[in-house]
């Protein structure tokens, strides 16, 4: 290949297929940040989902801030009618993958059954994804089955997999099959490095790239309520929102000006409302799910943000990053890897929610912070977020990784069966034969 062609390919916009279980998800707006950052850099992203159209889709797309022009390919009845033809075209790779799934079914019976049921949709996605430069599994779950199918075909797209919270907890055949077929494996916390290095094949590069947040412009300080506390999460028992209410109740006993606003929704909402009502906590306001931008405004008006989650899969929650960028004094549970976000008490406080009084003591200290101390803390926290947790900067790191793999020697088939399927516009793309990536 000529040097000029290499330079052109190295700077050309990438076509990226993003694979999701479902999209969008209210508690995963970081996915939208990734896609928006890629689009802002000139790359073309198409979303493929394993699950069908969500309820109240238009409202969900709006509240999550999904770009209007983003193509989203979901399973549907018309899509399912095309699955038999796709399965026939992919009968070799599909049969091999089914065999791999069945071989592990004794150890993972439920996951194996789910994987077999998802196989037709995975084949349909793989059939369309051949025309892309990159196919990225956002989670190493059922939709990640697309990667071993593409690998078996030696299709052109670079195959990468993210391993995160759900994958670490499941640690099952879906993770093994997805990661085993990836040409690069990414996770978002240094605490996960040992795991992904153990899971990835020896020749496959691994990299830690943090989930980023958009650096929303900041408002002027001076409008912050010094006694306003907030939390934001899915309202499920593992998020321990009751622990936040109890900590604020203890702080309010010392100063009745303390209030708590709770943002989010979920099955635990009714119980939390009843818990507060029975105790006469009229200063607790459960306000439901709001847009990311609206939540950020609330953060900039609050003094303290608390997240006392006990969820085993909690890793560097983006809502904590947003609270730090907004200038809140942050109190977080000691979830794995949280020290990457809160290196010491000058950035925020880490507590063990299982230790009686730990959150209450941290909250009293946060509410007693001087304005000078708060100003210094905000400057340090914002510098950390800008340097390590900007979605624009971190998606540039993804692009660099994808380009490195694209430009490395790879084995790509030129057989008719492995050529990309025609796009909706009738376009196809030729494929080069290259030696295997080492």
For each predicted feature, which ranges?
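Conserved donor-binding/catalytic core segment of Leloir-type glycosyltransferases
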Residues: 186, 213, 217-239, 245-250, ...
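Carbohydrate-associated surface elements
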Residues: 191, 212
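A short, well-ordered alpha-helix in the C-terminal region of glycosyltransferases
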Residues: 252, 373-397
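Nucleotide-activated donor-binding/catalytic signature segment of Leloir-type glycosyltransferases, i.e.
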Residues: 270-293
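Short alpha-helical donor nucleotide-sugar binding micro-motif in glycosyltransferases
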Residues: 289-290, 297-302
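Short alpha-helical segment that forms part of, or immediately flanks, the ligand-binding pocket
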Residues: 296, 314-325, 339-340
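Acidic donor-binding loop of glycosyltransferase active sites
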Residues: 300-314, 328
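Conserved acidic donor-binding segment of nucleotide-sugar-dependent glycosyltransferases
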Residues: 344-357, 366-371
């Amino acid at each position: 290949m000529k040097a000029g062609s290499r330079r052109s390919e190295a700077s050309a916009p990438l076509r990226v297929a993003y694979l999701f279980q479902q999209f969008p998800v209210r508690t995963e707006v970081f996915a939208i940040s990734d896609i928006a950052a890629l689009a802002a850099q000139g790359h073309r992203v198409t979303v493929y989902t394993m699950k069908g159209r969500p309820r109240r889709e238009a409202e969900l797309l709006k509240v999550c801030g999904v770009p209007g022009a983003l193509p989203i390919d979901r399973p549907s009845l018309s899509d399912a009618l095309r699955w038999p033809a796709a399965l026939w075209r992919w009968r070799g790779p599909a049969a091999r993958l089914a065999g791999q799934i069945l071989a592990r079914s004794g150890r993972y019976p439920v996951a194996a059954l789910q994987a077999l049921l998802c196989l037709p949709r995975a084949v349909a996605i793989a059939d369309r994804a051949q025309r892309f430069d990159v196919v990225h599994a956002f989670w190493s779950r059922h939709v990640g089955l697309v990667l071993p199918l593409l690998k078996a075909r030696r299709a052109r797209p670079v195959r990468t997999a993210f391993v995160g919270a759900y994958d670490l907890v499941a640690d099952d055949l879906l993770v093994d099959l997805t990661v085993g077929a990836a040409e690069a494996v990414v996770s978002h916390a240094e605490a996960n490095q040992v795991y992904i290095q153990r899971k990835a094949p020896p020749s496959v590069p691994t990299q830690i790239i943090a989930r980023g947040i958009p650096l929303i412009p900041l408002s002027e300080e001076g409008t912050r309520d010094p006694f306003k506390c907030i939390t934001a999460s899915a309202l499920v028992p593992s998020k321990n929102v009751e622990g936040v209410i109890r900590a604020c109740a203890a702080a309010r006993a010392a100063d009745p000006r303390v209030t708590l606003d709770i943002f989010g929704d979920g099955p635990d909402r009714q119980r939390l409302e009843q818990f507060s009502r029975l105790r006469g906590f009229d200063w607790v306001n459960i306000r439901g799910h709001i847009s990311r931008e609206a939540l950020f405004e609330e953060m900039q008006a609050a003094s303290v943000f608390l997240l006392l989650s006990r969820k085993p899969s909690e890793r560097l929650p983006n809502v904590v990053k947003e609270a730090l960028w907004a200038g809140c004094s942050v109190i977080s549970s000691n979830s794995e890897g949280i020290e990457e976000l809160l290196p010491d008490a000058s950035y925020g406080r880490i507590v063990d929610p299982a230790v009686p009084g730990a959150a209450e003591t941290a909250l009293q200290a946060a509410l007693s912070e001087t304005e000078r101390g708060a100003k210094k803390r905000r400057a340090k926290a914002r510098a950390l977020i800008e340097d390590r947790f900007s979605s624009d900067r971190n998606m540039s790191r993804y692009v660099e990784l994808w380009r490195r793999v694209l430009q490395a020697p790879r084995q790509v088939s030129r057989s008719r069966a492995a050529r990309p399927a025609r796009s909706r516009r009738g376009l196809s793309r030729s494929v080069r034969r290259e030696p295997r990536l080492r």
